[in-house]
Design a protein with these regions (language model features):
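Short, low-complexity, Pro/Ser/Thr/Gly-rich segments in the mature regions of secreted, periplasmic
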Residues: 137, 141-152
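...with weaker cross-activation on analogous glycine-rich loops/strands in unrelated enzymes
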Residues: 22-25, 70-130
Length: 153
Protein backbone atom coordinates (compact mmCIF):
# COMPACT_ATOMS: atom_id res chain seq x y z
CA UNK A 1 0.00 0.00 0.00
CA UNK A 2 1.37 3.38 -0.95
CA UNK A 3 0.47 6.29 1.29
CA UNK A 4 2.19 8.99 -0.71
CA UNK A 5 4.72 10.54 1.60
CA UNK A 6 6.11 13.73 0.17
CA UNK A 7 9.32 15.33 1.26
CA UNK A 8 8.11 17.57 4.06
CA UNK A 9 9.76 20.75 2.87
CA UNK A 10 8.79 23.55 5.18
CA UNK A 11 8.97 27.12 4.13
CA UNK A 12 9.46 28.49 7.61
CA UNK A 13 12.36 28.35 10.06
CA UNK A 14 11.39 29.19 13.58
CA UNK A 15 14.57 28.07 15.34
CA UNK A 16 18.23 27.84 14.55
CA UNK A 17 19.13 24.85 16.69
CA UNK A 18 22.75 23.73 16.76
CA UNK A 19 23.08 22.02 20.15
CA UNK A 20 23.15 18.24 19.89
CA UNK A 21 22.29 17.70 23.55
CA UNK A 22 19.18 15.82 24.58
CA UNK A 23 16.60 16.75 27.18
CA UNK A 24 16.10 14.80 30.42
CA UNK A 25 12.45 14.01 31.04
CA UNK A 26 10.24 11.37 32.61
CA UNK A 27 8.19 8.62 31.02
CA UNK A 28 5.13 10.72 31.87
CA UNK A 29 6.48 13.46 29.60
CA UNK A 30 6.91 10.97 26.75
CA UNK A 31 3.29 9.89 27.15
CA UNK A 32 2.18 13.55 27.13
CA UNK A 33 4.18 14.05 23.93
CA UNK A 34 2.55 11.07 22.21
CA UNK A 35 -0.92 12.04 23.44
CA UNK A 36 -0.41 15.56 22.05
CA UNK A 37 0.68 14.23 18.67
CA UNK A 38 -2.34 11.91 18.55
CA UNK A 39 -4.72 14.86 18.92
CA UNK A 40 -3.81 15.65 15.30
CA UNK A 41 -4.77 12.23 13.89
CA UNK A 42 -6.78 12.72 10.71
CA UNK A 43 -5.67 16.33 10.14
CA UNK A 44 -4.88 16.92 6.46
CA UNK A 45 -1.44 17.37 4.96
CA UNK A 46 -0.30 20.94 4.31
CA UNK A 47 3.28 21.80 3.37
CA UNK A 48 4.69 24.06 6.07
CA UNK A 49 1.59 23.58 8.25
CA UNK A 50 1.80 23.64 12.05
CA UNK A 51 -1.80 23.61 13.28
CA UNK A 52 -5.21 21.96 12.94
CA UNK A 53 -5.69 23.53 9.48
CA UNK A 54 -2.98 21.23 8.14
CA UNK A 55 0.42 19.78 8.98
CA UNK A 56 3.49 18.39 7.35
CA UNK A 57 5.62 15.72 9.05
CA UNK A 58 8.07 18.06 10.74
CA UNK A 59 5.28 20.45 11.69
CA UNK A 60 3.54 17.65 13.60
CA UNK A 61 6.71 16.73 15.49
CA UNK A 62 7.63 20.39 16.04
CA UNK A 63 4.29 21.33 17.66
CA UNK A 64 4.05 18.15 19.75
CA UNK A 65 7.49 18.78 21.27
CA UNK A 66 6.73 22.49 21.67
CA UNK A 67 3.66 21.56 23.76
CA UNK A 68 5.96 19.82 26.28
CA UNK A 69 8.39 22.77 26.21
CA UNK A 70 11.09 21.22 24.04
CA UNK A 71 12.26 23.31 21.10
CA UNK A 72 13.26 21.47 17.94
CA UNK A 73 14.18 22.80 14.51
CA UNK A 74 11.30 23.12 12.07
CA UNK A 75 12.62 20.95 9.20
CA UNK A 76 13.11 17.18 9.34
CA UNK A 77 16.70 17.35 8.04
CA UNK A 78 17.56 19.78 10.85
CA UNK A 79 15.67 17.70 13.43
CA UNK A 80 17.86 14.75 12.47
CA UNK A 81 20.81 16.61 14.00
CA UNK A 82 19.03 17.00 17.37
CA UNK A 83 19.33 14.69 20.35
CA UNK A 84 21.49 11.64 19.80
CA UNK A 85 21.45 8.95 17.15
CA UNK A 86 20.61 5.52 18.54
CA UNK A 87 20.39 1.98 17.19
CA UNK A 88 17.08 0.86 15.72
CA UNK A 89 17.26 -2.04 18.20
CA UNK A 90 17.15 0.44 21.10
CA UNK A 91 14.11 2.41 19.89
CA UNK A 92 11.43 3.33 22.43
CA UNK A 93 8.34 5.52 22.67
CA UNK A 94 9.07 9.18 22.00
CA UNK A 95 12.05 8.58 19.70
CA UNK A 96 12.14 10.12 16.23
CA UNK A 97 12.41 8.05 13.06
CA UNK A 98 13.97 9.67 10.01
CA UNK A 99 13.45 8.61 6.42
CA UNK A 100 14.77 9.34 2.94
CA UNK A 101 11.63 9.05 0.84
CA UNK A 102 10.98 9.47 -2.88
CA UNK A 103 14.58 8.51 -3.72
CA UNK A 104 15.93 11.65 -2.03
CA UNK A 105 19.58 11.85 -1.04
CA UNK A 106 18.91 13.50 2.30
CA UNK A 107 16.46 13.02 5.14
CA UNK A 108 13.10 14.48 4.20
CA UNK A 109 10.56 12.77 6.48
CA UNK A 110 10.15 12.28 10.24
CA UNK A 111 7.82 10.33 12.50
CA UNK A 112 7.36 10.01 16.27
CA UNK A 113 7.43 6.51 17.81
CA UNK A 114 4.13 5.78 19.59
CA UNK A 115 4.40 2.05 20.36
CA UNK A 116 7.17 -0.53 20.60
CA UNK A 117 6.17 -4.19 20.82
CA UNK A 118 6.75 -6.80 18.14
CA UNK A 119 6.01 -3.89 15.84
CA UNK A 120 7.23 -0.29 15.98
CA UNK A 121 4.46 2.19 15.28
CA UNK A 122 4.92 5.88 14.60
CA UNK A 123 2.75 8.92 13.99
CA UNK A 124 3.54 11.08 10.97
CA UNK A 125 1.92 12.91 8.09
CA UNK A 126 1.15 11.42 4.68
CA UNK A 127 0.38 13.82 1.85
CA UNK A 128 -2.62 11.67 0.84
CA UNK A 129 -3.96 10.54 4.22
CA UNK A 130 -2.91 13.34 6.57
CA UNK A 131 -1.77 12.50 10.10
CA UNK A 132 -1.71 8.73 10.53
CA UNK A 133 -0.03 5.96 12.51
CA UNK A 134 2.09 3.55 10.49
CA UNK A 135 4.41 0.62 11.15
CA UNK A 136 8.09 0.20 10.40
CA UNK A 137 7.15 -3.27 9.13
CA UNK A 138 5.38 -1.69 6.15
CA UNK A 139 7.70 -2.29 3.19
CA UNK A 140 7.91 1.37 2.16
CA UNK A 141 8.98 2.55 5.61
CA UNK A 142 11.26 -0.43 6.23
CA UNK A 143 13.27 0.42 3.12
CA UNK A 144 13.37 4.21 3.60
CA UNK A 145 14.13 4.38 7.36
CA UNK A 146 17.68 5.67 7.79
CA UNK A 147 18.07 7.03 11.32
CA UNK A 148 16.62 6.99 14.85
CA UNK A 149 17.21 9.84 17.31
CA UNK A 150 16.44 10.10 21.00
CA UNK A 151 15.44 13.56 22.18
CA UNK A 152 13.98 12.63 25.56
CA UNK A 153 16.16 10.47 27.81
Amino acid sequence: MSVGVMSCKSTSRLHSYTDNSFTKASYKTVIQLIDEAKTYLGITYKAGGTDYRGLDCSGLVFIAFKKINISLPRKSIDMSKSGRIISFNDVRKGDLLFFKTNNKLEINHVGLVTDVDDDIKFIHTSNQLGVIISSTKEAYYAKTLVQVNRIID
